[in-house]
């Protein structure tokens, strides 16, 4: 059965696409058809508008990712296609320029956002959105930022912000966009005024469905959410709502997602109880048997840890198993990929198996003897069913029977360990 929220979101996306298509059909033919390629019908990244910003009265649009060959007269001529332009301003940069277009009426500006966002100008998709002063948006430079990955292509700043606004101190949300394609890079950042809210958001939102995908949440690397402030023609500082490129976040150093990148071998473990130690986490993942563990770290004050495996498939299996296993200290842990790949050439140094968990009244030697005794008991019962007419040839060769082996365990000795192991493998 389809998720009602997902169904409702899909209906909204379809309605938005229909509105955009109608706007395109109504608009006048554009200038320079050889320079400006037809648009791609994609959801408009409406963004998380700042408090105090009223788009119903806005007549100005921001234009980002402009090709360096574009001139200011050409920019104004193109945007005149949606309505009369009052003024325009182009700010040149080395890699790509940006600018602002001021219309006489809001309808022309809204139509420009609907019809021109994503259009390719000299082979480069431009981004068009409402323009507003930076002062209207809260300064989040000192806030606590989290990384949100595996975002669906249709998720915008506004969608992301709405999903995390259930946490009272959520202050901002931004989806990162690829300047070359004009599409979402599949991840973004959410800011919080309160550190505890940020941690709670990581714990509670990791693995939750947002649109058509399960998102993953983690702490963001310092400086990963920085964006470039822009200056408008009247000197007011303005920032683009959907800022984002491969240079905006350290998480984008590798173009591939962790799921498809063999260099990612570390598992992020969230929602840990305060009393969980490094040894506890090691025991938990060792018991899963997903693979060879090479490193275990725990940040007890922040409630998360990391488990590094020898290979990528082992880490992937650990994530899958960790999210479906019983609780650890009465909490359901949440596993996802770590945000950094294992550096190439890292030496393999497997950790030794962790010491068994203490049981009241029993020593480690007692537990080891008990495990051996249990294995022999199972071996004897299976052997009795399979070889009722005679002894197993290996048992005959070594002179062992079930009762004798069990007695040897109680006497504290076990001279035929190798023989018993052979019996366990060959029965």
Curated annotation (Swiss-Prot):
Gene Ontology terms: cellular component: cytoplasm; nucleus
Compartment annotation: Nucleus
Comp. bias regions, Low complexity: 9-23
Domain of life of the native organism: Eukaryota
Keyword Repeat: yes
Residue span(s) of domain RRM: 59-133, 144-222, 265-340
Annotated segments matching region Disordered: 1-23, 223-261
Predominant location: nucleus
One Gene Ontology biological process: mRNA processing
Keyword RNA-binding: yes
Phosphoserine found at: 246
Record keywords: mRNA processing, Nucleus, Phosphoprotein, Repeat, RNA-binding
GO molecular function, one term: mRNA binding
Subunit structure: Interacts with UBA1A and UBA2A.
Role this protein plays: Heterogeneous nuclear ribonucleoprotein (hnRNP)-like protein that acts as a component of the pre-mRNA processing machinery. Functions at multiple steps to facilitate the nuclear maturation of plant pre-mRNAs.
Name of the protein described by the UniProt record: Oligouridylate-binding protein 1C
UniProt lineage: Eukaryota, Viridiplantae, Streptophyta, Embryophyta, Tracheophyta
Gene symbol of the encoding locus: UBP1C
């Amino acid at each position: 059965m389809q998720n009602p929220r997902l169904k409702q979101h899909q209906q909204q996306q379809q309605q938005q696409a229909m509105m955009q298509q109608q706007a395109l059909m109504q608009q006048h033919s554009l200038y320079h058809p050889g320079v400006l390629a037809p648009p791609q019908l994609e959801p408009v990244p409406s963004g998380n508008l700042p408090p105090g910003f009223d788009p119903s009265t806005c007549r100005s649009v921001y234009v980002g990712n402009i090709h360096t060959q574009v001139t200011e007269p050409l920019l104004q001529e193109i945007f005149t296609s949606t309505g009369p332009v009052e003024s325009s301003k182009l700010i040149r940069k080395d890699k790509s320029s940006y600018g602002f277009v001021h219309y006489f009426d809001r309808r022309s500006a809204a139509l420009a956002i609907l019809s021109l966002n994503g259009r390719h100008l000299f082979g480069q998709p431009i981004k068009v959105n409402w323009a507003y002063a930076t002062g209207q948006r809260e300064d989040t430079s000192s806030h606590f930022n989290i990384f949100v990955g595996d975002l669906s292509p249709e998720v915008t700043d506004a969608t992301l912000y709405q999903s995390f606004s259930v946490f009272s101190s959520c202050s901002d949300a931004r989806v990162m966009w690829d300047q070359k394609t004009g599409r979402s890079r599949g991840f973004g950042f959410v800011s919080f005024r309160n550190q505890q809210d940020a941690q709670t958001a990581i714990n509670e939102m990791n693995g939750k469905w947002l649109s058509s995908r399960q998102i993953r949440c983690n702490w963001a690397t310092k400086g990963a959410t920085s964006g470039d402030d822009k200056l408008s023609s009247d000197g007011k500082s303005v920032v683009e709502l959907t800022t984002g490129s491969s240079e905006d976040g350290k998480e984008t150093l590798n173009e591939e997602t962790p799921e498809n990148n063999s260099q990612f071998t570390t598992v992020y473990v969230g929602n840990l109880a305060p009393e969980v130690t490094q040894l506890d986490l090691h025991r938990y993942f060792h018991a899963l048997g997903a693979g060879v563990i090479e490193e275990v770290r725990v940040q007890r004050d922040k409630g998360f840890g990391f488990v590094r495996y020898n290979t990528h498939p082992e880490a992937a299996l650990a994530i899958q198993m960790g999210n479906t296993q019983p609780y650890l200290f009465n909490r359901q842990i949440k596993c996802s990929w770590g945000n950094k790949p294992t550096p190439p050439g890292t030496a393999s140094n497997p950790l030794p198996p962790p010491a068994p968990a203490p049981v009241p009244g029993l020593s480690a030697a007692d537990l080891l003897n008990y495990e051996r005794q249990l294995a022999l008991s199972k071996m004897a019962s299976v052997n009795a069913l399979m070889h009722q007419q005679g002894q197993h040839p290996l048992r005959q060769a070594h002179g062992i029977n079930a009762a004798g082996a069990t007695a040897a365990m109680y006497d504290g000795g076990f001279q035929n360990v190798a023989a018993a192991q052979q019996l366990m493998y060959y029965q």
